[in-house]
């Protein structure tokens, strides 16, 4: 069995890699200097780059559906849903900028959570294997705990985060149990 992997085989996942790289850049920007406008702009630029790449690939006519490592299938429907996820994330990051601006401390981490959740959602729609599906689902849902409880000064926000954590943990356990019944 051949386990070598070249960069050309990973090319269909470049939009997801752009979003993941943007989250790393945002983390570094926060570590170096906290600037809410710079972090928000970097997030929007990264999401736009990924959306433009998907739109270009979809409309150039040179795209061939690709199976990446047997775990992800990138076809026109996958790219359409990834594009819709990016548009929704762009709307969320743009609209949340003014809302988060009113908070005094730790405004920038919301964008890291958003980018990680978007990367998980983009991988989720491309997954073609249960292991990739579950890992992508968790990558998408775990940052949502933090986003729900982000304004922890409000009791409803913290309560929502804890309730979602319990509900999601139960759902993940049931999902794993179902996968074990199918494959075991």
Please identify what each model-predicted range represents.
Residues 1-184:
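Alpha-helical transmembrane segments of multi-pass membrane proteins predominantly involved
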């Amino acid at each position: 069995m051949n386990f070598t992997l070249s960069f050309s085989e990973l090319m269909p996942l470049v939009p997801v890699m752009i979003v993941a790289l943007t989250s790393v850049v945002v983390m570094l920007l926060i570590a170096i200097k906290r600037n809410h406008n710079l972090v928000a702009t970097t997030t929007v630029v990264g999401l736009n780059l990924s959306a433009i790449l998907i739109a270009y690939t979809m409309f150039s006519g040179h795209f061939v559906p690709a199976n990446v490592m047997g775990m992800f299938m990138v076809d026109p429907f996958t790219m359409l849903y990834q594009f819709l996820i990016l548009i929704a994330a762009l709307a969320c990051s743009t609209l949340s900028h003014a809302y988060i601006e009113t908070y005094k401390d730790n405004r920038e981490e919301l964008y890291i959570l958003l980018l990680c959740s978007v990367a998980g959602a983009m991988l989720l729609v491309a997954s073609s294997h249960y292991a990739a599906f579950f890992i992508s689902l968790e990558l998408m849902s775990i940052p949502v705990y933090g986003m729900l409880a982000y304004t922890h000064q409000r009791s409803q926000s913290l309560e929502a985060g804890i309730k979602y954590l319990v509900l999601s943990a139960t759902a993940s356990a049931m999902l794993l149990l179902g996968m074990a019944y199918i494959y075991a």
